[in-house]
């Protein structure tokens, strides 16, 4: 279990502010909205992790700050380069074909830099099959960043390595609601990364979740990177974010 202390801030930018989730269910101490280069930026502030070495955010004046940009693939070229470069994550959702998604995303890789002390390149680029999958990922990030206590301690290096796209290795992330209605298919078994999000109230059994996670993990190829987490909420569900490689 991980416990946060101090101040932390999540900044989510999007040209269309109606797509930005509020994350109010995670009870941020402050939520504000500002405009930067014509782009809406929502800021969620909450009280830095005691052991901050795993936080992949810039630290300014003692505040852990994590910057995320959400954009459609067709809008990438309209975003100023200075905005793209300062992000920790750029989330791109598909509006047409997978081939066009890959074409729009490729220029982002030339903006990436790797600091000597870091294992990944920034901004990390994540590609999604649709905007709903991207928003589900944002909710996952919001829970990890804004909730004061995490039941499952997740290393975000693992998340980036499993789901971020790289030059010549573009992954497209789709969403499935395993509980209550969908099932994994034979095609899903070939994904390269899977994030399983178990949600439920205080009655949710950790032992039961571990069993479910183990059973679902057997549905994937042994080489797949599988991450699972627990989010406390009123409704019980299991959501899967699945990353498959696009032909590039």
Predicted feature descriptions by range:
Residues 1-248:
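Tubulin/FtsZ superfamily GTPase core signature
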